[in-house]
């Protein structure tokens, strides 16, 4: 057994040969964070008393949902054959929406632990993360987790994993993050096989920013991986992309609580605090160098994450608009992938059009806005980016249905993605049926082992971003897993469906849908609004239209007073006169009356399963 390191190596004085930088990559729910907990405990960084499950997941939302959203970096000491190593572990998210977090973490590592659940086997996200790691030339250590489960079948999945990455099934380590079995062997394997970082200690300092978070008291905390040279406290540093200079107020390592040090040397992973309040000053992927002796060449950065899904966020109370702006600014600090710009809607007032990486990202951001900042928001139905070419050859980029141009349209192109779905072979039929109903085109199928299939489709992103994942899970009893990547765009027969209330368009309910599904969407929305809008003194028609053509209609019946109540018996002409008079009044009222759509109706219509249009 490897003993606890008698003393940890001091940051800034650590020989790069004793540093090991690695991350844990796996599909969602395969036990990354639990394994990280055991490592923290076994290396003695966190004592048993202050240990809690998912120690590194700091956000309430992460803990409640049991998912990791932000990567975390931790330095741990480990002793092997009389030599002490400094292991820098980066815990990464497993969800497809946060793959950019994973790619950033991989760029700061030399090795990766590929973790697979011994009861579930390889899943879509396992493959996606593995390919990311291979692109970064990382040394991969295959590991099966959860071997203590009664349903675990380590021999079968060890063979599957070995055939996937090439190697012998006996090389696949078997651990249990829950009981701690095999974790020491894993730490030994990490120390032995992951290459030490390479860098020039005498060159000009270069450090890569792989994450930055905002701390209310200390400003922006920037996580960096040193490549060359050394950084020390009170040194002036410069960001290579913005040329901004700052002074390092504090520099140190997370282990796992922030621990100040005398600096950072080659290959080390740590944090900097410069007292800057604007996170845009420390962009993820940027290179940090010293102002006195700047490096000439920046490190190759990452590609900026591109938003895939757009949605409007509007405060329910218009006076909260400045608070919403501040809240988004603060979230942007710790979430580089969030993009937003102000927009106004006739129906909803002032708000922001925000770009997200996917639906989970959208859900997490809206939940954080309501929790951390106490905002009540309306979220409009998510949409993707369309390129619309009109007859005069002008191309317009549309992220919001209200920007869809009128007049003759030559073509509309929408983004498509390559989707890979992994599931047990019994569900292939239902999966294909679902994908075809969403305009998917089959690319191919592959059997992984005797009972699991990978089905590959190209599909329009607009069909995936709503409820595709939920439907996929419910049709496959929760066994299927999905991964997708952008694959260009294609021209499609898309139309904008407007919802008219008493002949007036309500922009918040407009949607861009495929022509075949336009009627279903129109019927769904008009039916839903009929239930939600309160009855008026006059009849209110609710119509769905494509351009000037009405495709569906519902009416809200008028409320009417019983004007005949006072006539007891009496002549029919008297009754007719009163009824005609009432009818006349209703007609006049209809001409001048306006329909107020209550806030609740907006929320219910937009948040309800507005997207059941694909049924």
UniProtKB/Swiss-Prot annotation:
Q: Which GO terms describe its cellular component?
A: plasma membrane
Q: Where in the cell is it found?
A: Cell membrane
Give the source's domain of life in one word: Bacteria
Keywords attached to this Swiss-Prot or TrEMBL record, sorted alphabetically, are: Cell membrane, GTP-binding, Hydrolase, Membrane, Nucleotide-binding, Protein biosynthesis
Zinc-finger listed as a keyword: no
Q: Name one GO molecular function term.
A: GTPase activity
Its membrane topology is listed as: Peripheral membrane protein
Q: Identify which top EC class this enzyme belongs to.
A: hydrolase
Supply the PROSITE patterns for this chain.
G_TR_1 (PS00301), G_TR_2 (PS51722)
Annotated ranges, domain tr-type G: 17-198
Q: Which GO terms describe its biological process?
A: positive regulation of translation
Quote the EC number. 3.6.5.n1
Q: Where does GTP bind?
A: 29-34, 145-148
- Chief localisation class: membrane
Q: Which InterPro entries match?
A: EF-4 (IPR006297), EFG_III/V (IPR035647), EFG_V-like (IPR000640), EFTu-like_2 (IPR004161), G_TR_CS (IPR031157), LepA_C_sf (IPR038363), LepA_CTD (IPR013842), LepA_IV (IPR035654)
Q: Which family does it belong to?
A: Belongs to the TRAFAC class translation factor GTPase superfamily. Classic translation factor GTPase family. LepA subfamily.
This protein's name? Elongation factor 4
State the species of origin.
Answer: Clavibacter michiganensis subsp. michiganensis (strain NCPPB 382)
Which gene codes for it?
A: lepA
